[in-house]
Amino acid sequence: MPSITADEWLEAAAHRRSVHGLAGTSKVSDERVQELVSNVLSFAPSSYNTQPVRISLAFGEKHKELWSIILEKVEPVLKSINPALWKKLGPFLQNHKAAYGSILFWERGQTTKEAAETHKATSHMFSEWGDHAQGIHQILVWTALELEGVGANLQHMNAIPPVEAAIKKFAGVPEDYKLKAHLNYGDEQAAHPEKPKKLPIAETLTIL
């Protein structure tokens, strides 16, 4: 049995917040981050144990290089929509570049395709189940990093197609990989964010 209680585990999960304005340093070593991510990959569940999740790590200068590529692709897209949009979001994205590291979460498309072909009765569900697996991996890695003492925030730069293609090229992943999320991390430079207000439990929990 684990050495922590359910309440302790939930307290750890509740500590996780979206932390912005991160420093370009990390009190957690690259080796420790790799160890934490490897641990999550070794046990996090997926439907039928299909294991569609893949993760790439970028530390230090590689993180900066990655974000330089992202900014290069994002700027013309946002300016074409509205120059004011880039003026507003550009500094926010630069803050992500200023962090220390990146954790990229991918879905291996071939895994999802093979699972759908093997389990035809539920073939239409594997994309959704893959998203469930992604969420589990992301929250576990994110919480583990914050327990180690660094802050993190989850981004979805794949919302802009040219950006995802550029990130895939930079990471050298196979063509069937789909970027699902991008976790930035680094030392916190301000007070840890408070938990936001939630709806009353009476509105979100039903006893049948």
Which functions belong to the PLM regions below?
Residues E114-T118, A165-A166, E194-K195:
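A short secondary-structure junction signal
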Residues E75-N82, K169-K195:
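A glycine-rich helix N-cap at a beta->alpha junction
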Residues L104-A116:
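A structural motif
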Residues G101-W106, L183:
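Active-site-flanking beta-strand signature of metal-NTP-handling nucleotidyl enzymes
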Residues V40-L41, G109, H119-I167:
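Small-aliphatic-rich amphipathic alpha-helix that forms the alpha element of a beta-alpha
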Residues M1-G101, T204-L208:
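N-terminal amphipathic, basic helical "cap/leader" segment at the start of enzyme domains
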Residues E194-L208:
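Phosphate/diphosphate-binding glycine-rich loops and adjacent basic-rich segments that engage nucleotide
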Residues I69-K73, A115-K120:
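Short, flexible, mixed-charge acidic loops at enzyme active sites
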